[in-house]
Design a protein with these regions (language model features):
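An N-cap/entry alpha-helix motif that binds or orients negatively charged groups
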Residues: 1-44
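Short glycine-enriched loops at secondary-structure junctions
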Residues: 55-56, 88-92, 141, 182
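Short alpha-helical segments and helix-capping/turn motifs at coil-helix boundaries
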Residues: 32-37, 96, 120-126
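Alpha/beta enzyme core
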Residues: 64, 74-75, 103-105, 115-198
């Protein structure tokens, strides 16, 4: 469901990734290379996390529904030593099943909430708390999706003050996914976000 607008986002991203080169430096102490890192007090095997996906059957395949996909995703990421973000959407079961999978993994996953109205966000935050998630995210770039723009009560983009109010509802780190500009990154920081995903 990505590549909105001109439809070339995935292609342009692929082209840009082809420009990235690893610069090898052999003037270092000879030892085992490690990609391990720590985030929010947890250890991970690599700085690579699986992104949030919802409405799996509608967008991708009949092989999985949201519930079975989230279970497989969370389990596989945990076995690989990384974490997964889980998705959200119009169907409440998307968020519920993601949080259930995170709970089954002892909170090792990051439920991702769409930028709904505050009352819906509060309900979804309660699900993340029941799941004992170690962090919670919001995919703020979803604000442009037609179903959010036309939602009643209003949903979508958030001001710094609105984002801060959401941060204050949480007792775990809050990640803002879908930051597109340096200015937006500074706004997320001002609101109290613990991290961003560009």
């Amino acid at each position: 469901p990505g590549a909105k607008g001109t439809g070339d986002v995935a292609i342009r991203n692929f082209d840009k990734w082809r420009d990235v080169r690893v610069n090898m430096d052999t003037l270092v102490e000879k030892k085992q290379i490690s990609t391990d890192f720590e985030l929010f007090g947890k250890e991970f095997s690599a700085p690579i996390f699986a992104g949030p996906i919802g409405a799996v059957r509608m967008h991708y395949s009949d092989e999985y529904d949201d519930r079975s996909f989230n279970k497989v995703l969370i389990k596989a990421c945990n076995e690989a030593g990384i974490a997964a973000f889980t998705g959200d959407g119009m169907d409440d079961d998307q968020m519920v099943s993601g949080c259930e999978a995170v709970k089954e993994a002892d909170g090792h996953g990051i439920p991702t909430i769409k930028p709904w109205n505050l009352e819906m966000i509060k309900k979804k935050i309660e699900l993340t708390k029941e799941a004992n998630a170690f962090a919670v995210a919001m995919d703020i770039d979803a604000a442009g999706l037609p179903f959010l723009k036309n939602f009643t009560p209003p949903a979508g983009s958030k001001s710094v003050e609105q984002l801060r109010e959401i941060v204050e509802l949480l007792d775990v780190p809050f990640i803002v996914k879908g930051i597109m500009t340096p200015k937006a990154a500074l706004k997320a920081k001002e609101a109290g976000a613990s991290a961003i995903v560009v």
